[in-house]
Amino acid sequence: MGSLEMVPMGAGPPSPGGDPDGYDGGNNSQYPSASGSSGNTPTPPNDEERESNEEPPPPYEDPYWGNGDRHSDYQPLGTQDQSLYLGLQHDGNDGLPPPPYSPRDDSSQHIYEEAGRGSMNPVCLPVIVAPYLFWLAAIAASCFTASVSTVVTATGLALSLLLLAAVASSYAAAQRKLLTPVTVLTAVVTFFAICLTWRIEDPPFNSLLFALLAAAGGLQGIYVLVMLVLLILAYRRRWRRLTVCGGIMFLACVLVLIVDAVLQLSPLLGAVTVVSMTLLLLAFVLWLSSPGGLGTLGAALLTLAAALALLASLILGTLNLTTMFLLMLLWTLVVLLICSSCSSCPLSKILLARLFLYALALLLLASALIAGGSILQTNFKSLSSTEFIPNLFCMLLLIVAGILFILAILTEWGSGNRTYGPVFMCLGGLLTMVAGAVWLTVMSNTLLSAWILTAGFLIFLIGFALFGVIRCCRYCCYYCLTLESEERPPTPYRNTV
């Protein structure tokens, strides 16, 4: 009985190779439990006998820690067998071990948000905004009596601008330190050249005006040559021939347009048109070279300068409305075909539908600007100073609507943000409606004023459709805001293969 009191039930002295807590893996056969006979209990061996008769302990059969060594299965990621991660070859991580943490997605995961949220390749951005280049080319052709040679030259200029912007967009980000100062310098000089031409009368062959135009054209040519040299040095041999051909085409078209403007005894119109095209190109390149911060602000300012130059060409030139509308419609179809068939930027049905709505809004805005220019040109000579101010104010509203549309395209397809683009379009539609309503109140060309009002309303509806009723509910509905404010529970990262 004394032995039963001294030895607990099922317990024994710790084995030498076992756990320090006294657990030896269940091998307690030499120490019987209390149910056995107490008289046959063997005496424990001494230290010498234990060392001579000791056998290695059985493996530690713990399902959590593994076999034998507790830390045998814990190796650094660099020393692990790569065959463990063969199943991860197609997960976008090149078969490497998963990271030690899983980053959370900061974007909203609203249950009603549309799937497949993506943005186009930035290289395709000039393709989307190319209608504005053709728009300005059509204005240039109309200002220069719309001869066949001028139409061909203006179209070639627009194509070369598109080609140069598309090639430069993929390289501008790597060379932003060099491109941005040259772009800003060229834009500032050309903008002040425009401002000075407004202060000078327009007699034929004015020497000061011609010198300003030559200086602006020279700086633009230097900028284009610098960009071409950078492109030639950066790209391989397969790009050099295309770049040189595009640069020569661009310079030739600019020279032909300037010569045509001088021969038509209208250097101001030619300068305004060419500079507006160049400013738009510089805005795109500047925005692509630094998509955030000062780059976007510079693009907006350059676009404003281009819009002011466009306003000058609308006031001073004569427009061929049918030619402009046909060019806009044709290029809209071309943009749709290019973007749907281009393999480098695959389009889903959602992106294609949004692109179609943007193209439709572009046609409506172009028709509103054409109608406003017609009203302003019709009443330009017969209006008094009191009647000219509201007409000019309405035209400026239309120009601001065009600027908002350009910013909508830049934010939509440049950054992938689908919120601010439709908001800009809605604001542009409201400004167009205000311009049409003012012209209806003044009773100047009632039919065109009514069409401007209708076009603004349709643009506003398109912007609201792009914004989405569900997204509007998300930002305004109390229940949706409550869902957005709820914190998501943190999920631990599991390194399971």
UniProtKB/Swiss-Prot annotation:
A motif (PPxY motif) lies at residues 97-101. GO terms for cellular component: host cell endomembrane system; host cell perinuclear region of cytoplasm; host cell plasma membrane; membrane. The modification Phosphotyrosine is found at Y112. The keyword Transmembrane helix applies. Can be ubiquitinated by human ITCH and WWP2 on the N-terminus in a lysine-independent manner. The keyword Zinc-finger does not apply. Pfam families: Herpes_LMP2 (PF07415). Keywords: Host cell membrane, Host cytoplasm, Host membrane, Host-virus interaction, Membrane, Modulation of host E3 ubiquitin ligases by virus, Modulation of host ubiquitin pathway by virus, Phosphoprotein, Transmembrane, Transmembrane helix, Ubl conjugation. GO terms for biological process: symbiont-mediated perturbation of host ubiquitin-like protein modification; viral latency. Residues 145-147, 199-211, 263-267, 318, 376-388, 444-449 are extracellular. The chain crosses the membrane at residues 124-144, 148-168, 178-198, 212-232, 242-262, 268-288, 297-317, 319-339, 355-375, 389-409, 423-443, 450-470. Residues 1-123, 169-177, 233-241, 289-296, 340-354, 410-422, 471-497 are cytoplasmic. Residues 1-108 are annotated as: Disordered. Residues 27-41 have a biased composition (Polar residues). Belongs to the herpesviridae LMP-2 family. In healthy individuals, EBV typically establishes a persistent latent infection in which the virus can be detected in resting, nonproliferating peripheral B-lymphocytes. These latently infected cells express only 2 virally encoded genes, LMP2A and EBNA1. This is Latent membrane protein 2.
